C-alpha cells in the first residue's frame, strides 16, 4: 500500500525521479521481467539495484527524499520515517520502502548476483514510461529468482524461462521483413 493509503503504482514517477537525479541503477524483479515482455501478473512495486559508490548513493538519497520514501512495515501502512543519506543507505543489503507512488525496494546484492556491476554487464536500456530505463537481462532475473527460491518467484519461473527462450530464438533467428509481410498477407 502506498503512503497515501491508495493502491496506485506509478513506476513512471519513480523512474523519472531516479533519472532526474542521475542515479545509476538497474531495474530487477517482476517489473524488469514485464519490460522484457514476460506475461506475468502486473506488479505493484519496483525493485532496483543501485551502484554503491558514495556519490551515487547520495544522488539516490536525494531522489528518495523527493519521492518521500518511508520504511515499509505491515503495522504502519504509511511507513516509518526514514532519515537517510548515502552512508546510511549503504548499511543494509535491502531497503523495503513505500512512497506515495508505490512500493520501492532497493536490493544492493540480489540473490544469485554480485550486485550492480554484475547486472549492468548484460543489462538492456529500454524506453518505457517516457524514460530510458536500465533493465536487468531476463536470464539474470531468472538466475536471481531461482537463487531466492521464494514461492512467488518459483511460480513465475516457467513463464520467465519460456519468454527467455522466445527472445533468444528471435535474436538468433531474426526473420526478414518480407517474411513478416508474407505472413501477414497469408493470415499467418
Please describe what each predicted stretch is.
Residues 1-188:
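Compositionally biased terminal segments of proteins
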Amino acid at each position: 500500500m502506498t503512503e497515501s493509503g491508495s493502491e496506485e503504482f506509478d513506476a513512471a514517477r519513480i523512474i523519472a525521479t531516479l533519472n532526474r537525479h542521475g542515479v545509476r541503477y538497474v531495474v530487477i524483479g517482476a517489473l524488469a521481467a514485464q519490460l522484457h515482455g514476460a506475461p506475468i501478473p502486473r506488479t505493484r512495486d519496483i525493485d532496483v539495484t543501485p551502484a554503491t559508490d558514495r556519490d551515487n548513493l547520495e544522488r539516490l538519497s536525494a531522489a528518495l527524499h523527493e519521492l518521500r520514501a518511508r520504511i515499509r512495515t505491515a503495522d504502519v501502512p504509511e511507513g516509518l520515517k526514514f532519515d537517510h543519506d548515502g552512508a546510511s543507505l549503504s548499511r543494509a543489503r535491502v531497503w523495503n520502502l513505500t512512497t506515495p507512488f508505490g512500493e520501492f525496494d532497493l536490493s544492493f546484492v540480489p540473490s544469485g548476483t554480485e550486485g550492480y556491476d554484475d547486472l549492468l554487464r548484460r543489462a538492456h536500456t529500454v524506453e518505457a514510461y517516457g524514460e530510458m530505463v536500465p533493465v536487468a537481462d531476463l536470464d539474470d532475473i531468472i538466475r536471481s529468482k531461482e537463487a531466492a527460491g521464494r514461492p512467488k518467484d518459483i511460480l513465475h519461473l516457467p513463464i520467465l524461462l519460456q519468454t527467455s527462450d522466445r527472445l533468444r530464438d528471435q535474436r538468433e533467428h531474426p526473420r526478414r521483413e518480407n517474411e513478416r509481410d508474407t505472413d501477414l498477407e497469408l493470415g499467418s
